């Protein structure tokens, strides 16, 4: 959520930033109009309350002097009714303002490129060279079924489209990837490992920006009023919701693996085969809490943490800056990492790393103190995929496939695969 003072002091800037996202800047005028009404109501209410205090003294004085106080008692009642009415009006305006403010996205950083869609994202780095095959490479969805690493048909029978059973060495590879990623982040990148709740309440979803605007993308357990998480970013970021982080704690760096659940509303017909776009998938997440002046350097560091995984696995990738028309709701700046997939003959997103500045912290009321005597300030929050496990799985299977139908295990993963160096079709 944005600071109301930005609307008061820099309305032109806020309008231009909103317009860059393709949204209607008139919302700024709506907020300013409601803010003016609110301030007038507060002023009028304060005057009434001051008069009520004075009338209360007059009533007491008249009673002490045994004088008739009927007129001031009547005024007191009228004032009470008027104050109640003003408070009701103020509450209504507050609700309207909050309802609008919570749907306005974060302000985009000045160095984010302008554009309308992912076609306008800007490549800033490329690592590795896509492999040239001496044979016709297969898509990962064909490879995993031939090697009995996955079963899409039985998953569809049990749960519907966009689900998968990972079986045999497929399940082992998924687990190995999660263990490898978590181990690297905790032992080399300085993150604290967390196991997170995978059902959260509405306040938690509000804190990170999924609610109220993106409810259609979520799965909800109606009876309990809980939501399945679309990413571990949600519970990790809300760890400090409604808290003041004490001096000396920041920077705080969390990492956690979780299942992620997404309805994929609006993605009909896209990536319908394989592991790229499922309703349920595993992901290793990184979340950071930073002092405001440190958050931009933290974004660069977190992005290199994700890149280190891809490089150690030997997977060609590129880094792009998301343009103004493609960046997420809560982010001020986002880097996407895209891994090379031979089946697409293209790069596909495997990680997003974002600086959300104080946007989520204001929604979730996450503050910190620089020292014990200092006034609490809003922290900056960052999040990044480190990495999407299913997409990493797909990238390994495709990039490390062999002509004889086997898949070579990347060297970095061998210890996490029990020493296994290759996946072959099971005998049975």
From Swiss-Prot:
It is found in: Cytoplasm. The keyword ATP-binding applies. Homodimer. The tRNA molecule binds across the dimer. L-serine binds at residues 231-233, 285, 385. One of its GO terms (cellular component) is cytoplasm. Pfam families: Seryl_tRNA_N (PF02403), tRNA-synt_2b (PF00587). Pathway: Aminoacyl-tRNA biosynthesis; selenocysteinyl-tRNA(Sec) biosynthesis; L-seryl-tRNA(Sec) from L-serine and tRNA(Sec): step 1/1. GO terms for molecular function: ATP binding; catalytic activity, acting on a protein; serine-tRNA ligase activity; transferase activity. InterPro entries: aa-tRNA-synt_IIb, aa-tRNA-synth_II, aa-tRNA-synth_II/BPL/LPL, Ser-tRNA-ligase_type_1, Ser-tRNA-synth_1_N, SerRS_1_N_sf, SerRS_core, tRNA-bd_arm. Its EC number is 6.1.1.11. The lineage of its organism: Bacteria, Bacillati, Bacillota, Bacilli, Bacillales. It comes from the Bacteria. GO terms for biological process: selenocysteine biosynthetic process; seryl-tRNA aminoacylation. Catalyzes the attachment of serine to tRNA(Ser). Is also able to aminoacylate tRNA(Sec) with serine, to form the misacylated tRNA L-seryl-tRNA(Sec), which will be further converted into selenocysteinyl-tRNA(Sec). Belongs to the class-II aminoacyl-tRNA synthetase family. Type-1 seryl-tRNA synthetase subfamily. This is Serine--tRNA ligase. ATP binds at residues 262-264, 349-352. Keywords: Aminoacyl-tRNA synthetase, ATP-binding, Cytoplasm, Ligase, Nucleotide-binding, Protein biosynthesis. PANTHER family: SERINE--TRNA LIGASE, SERYL-TRNA SYNTHETASE. Consists of two distinct domains, a catalytic core and a N-terminal extension that is involved in tRNA binding. It catalyses: tRNA(Ser) + L-serine + ATP = L-seryl-tRNA(Ser) + AMP + diphosphate + H(+); tRNA(Sec) + L-serine + ATP = L-seryl-tRNA(Sec) + AMP + diphosphate + H(+).
């Amino acid at each position: 959520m944005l600071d109301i003072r930005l609307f008061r002091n820099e309305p032109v800037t806020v309008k231009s930033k909103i317009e860059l996202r393709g949204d209607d800047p008139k919302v700024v005028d709506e907020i300013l109009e409601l803010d003016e009404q609110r301030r007038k109501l507060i002023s009028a209410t304060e005057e009434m309350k001051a008069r009520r205090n004075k009338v209360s003294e007059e009533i007491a004085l008249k009673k002490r002097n045994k004088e008739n106080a009927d007129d001031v008692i009547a005024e007191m009642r009228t004032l009470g009714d008027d104050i109640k009415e003003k408070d009701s009006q103020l509450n209504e305006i507050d609700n309207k303002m909050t309802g609008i403010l919570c749907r306005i996205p974060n302000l985009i950083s000045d160095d984010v490129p302008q554009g309308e869609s992912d076609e306008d994202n800007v490549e800033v780095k490329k690592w590795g060279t896509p492999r040239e095959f001496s044979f016709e490479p297969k898509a990962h969805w064909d490879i995993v079924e031939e090697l009995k690493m996955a079963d899409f048909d039985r998953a569809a029978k049990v749960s519907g489209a966009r689900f998968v059973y990972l079986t045999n060495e497929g399940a082992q590879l998924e687990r190995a990837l999660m263990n490898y990623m978590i181990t690297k982040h905790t032992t080399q990148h300085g993150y604290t490992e967390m196991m997170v709740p995978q059902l959260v309440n509405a306040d938690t979803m509000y804190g990170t920006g999924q609610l109220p605007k993106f409810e259609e993308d979520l799965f909800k357990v109606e009876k309990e009023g809980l939501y399945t998480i679309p990413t571990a970013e949600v519970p990790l970021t809300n760890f400090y919701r409604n808290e003041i982080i004490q001096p000396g704690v920041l920077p705080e760096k969390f990492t956690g693996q979780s299942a992620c659940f997404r309805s994929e509303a609006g993605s009909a017909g896209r990536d319908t085969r394989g592991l790229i776009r499922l309703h349920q998938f595993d992901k290793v997440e990184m979340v950071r809490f930073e002092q405001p002046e440190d958050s931009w350097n933290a974004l660069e560091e977190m992005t290199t943490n994700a890149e280190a995984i891809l490089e150690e696995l030997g997977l060609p990738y590129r880094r792009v800056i998301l343009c103004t028309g493609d960046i997420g709701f809560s982010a001020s700046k986002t880097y996407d990492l895209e891994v090379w997939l031979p089946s697409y003959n293209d790069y596909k997103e495997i990680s997003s790393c974002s600086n959300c500045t104080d946007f989520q912290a204001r929604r979730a009321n996450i503050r910190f103190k620089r020292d014990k005597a200092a006034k609490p300030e809003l922290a900056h929050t960052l999040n990044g995929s480190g990495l999407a496990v299913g997409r990493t799985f797909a990238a390994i299977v495709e990039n490390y496939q062999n002509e004889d139908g086997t898949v070579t295990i990347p060297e970095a993963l061998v210890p996490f695969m029990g020493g296994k160096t290759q996946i072959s079709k099971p005998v049975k």
